[in-house]
Amino acid sequence: MELIEKHASFGGWQNVYRHYSQSLKCEMNVGVYLPPKAANEKLPVLYWLSGLTCNEQNFITKSGMQRYAAEHNIIVVAPDTSPRGSHVADADRYDLGQGAGFYLNATQAPWNEHYKMYDYIRNELPDLVMQHFPATTRKSISGHSMGGLGALVLALRNPDEYVSVSAFSPIVSPSQAPWGQQAFAAYLGENKDAWLDYDPVSLISQGQRVAEIMVDQGLSDDFYAEQLRTPNLEKICQEMNIKTLIRYHEGYDHSYYFVSSFIGEHIAYHANKLNMR
């Protein structure tokens, strides 16, 4: 991994690395925050998945998470949201193509050559983190919007691999929402059964489980009712007896003003779980 940015932050280092991804067949950037204690010992890892139009920069520059990661001794890994490059398929819209990988493995041309974000996040990136950084095997996952969707899907499909999961403003029923329907039709085709592998509410209804789910949702979020549908997640978790910590916040929208207001509580939540044995 090639170091392309290095910034001192709260006694640790906010770095950005570039590497060639075998899963995605392109160069990828990834942000890695190494807290002060990473200089002397191995630490657990929190993976953060960003939302539509984002890259690796949004979370590391806007959330203020470094203060809390340093306090709680957690490495934070923030990858890009899709494969990148002039040779990678794209669309002239913000919710499909580059910047909108949806953390799935595409099966339809032209997307299936590069869009394997599920494999990248689940397998390739953790292997690289273990190889290059002082990381323990204990990891958790979180994200925002499309990234909250990705975090929930990865945790629900791989409950033994992630200690905990949380999300800000996630797309919880993508097969029922315009963003998800349009992306899934392009990436996965018209067989809607394939869509359900990347739909958190559907996965839970099929019996997939995690110990607990933490979600924060702003009630002034323009996408709340049509795209996000947080109450659907709350309802299915109640029906399937999955413990939740779902909080609704008056006045907060879909932006990083919202994420930055509560990211400290999410990192503390994951730190508590990661440090339990």
Swiss-Prot record:
GO terms for biological process: formaldehyde catabolic process. Pfam families: Esterase (PF00756). GO terms for cellular component: cytosol. The active site is at 145 (charge relay system), 221 (charge relay system), 254 (charge relay system). The keyword Coiled coil does not apply. Coiled coil: none annotated. The keyword Transmembrane does not apply. Keywords: Hydrolase, Serine esterase. It is an enzyme of class 3 (hydrolase). GO terms for molecular function: carboxylic ester hydrolase activity; S-formylglutathione hydrolase activity. InterPro entries: AB_hydrolase_fold, Esterase-like, S-formylglutathione_hydrol. Its EC number is 3.1.2.12. It catalyses: S-formylglutathione + H2O = formate + glutathione + H(+). Belongs to the esterase D family. Serine hydrolase involved in the detoxification of formaldehyde. Hydrolyzes S-formylglutathione to glutathione and formate. This is S-formylglutathione hydrolase FrmB.
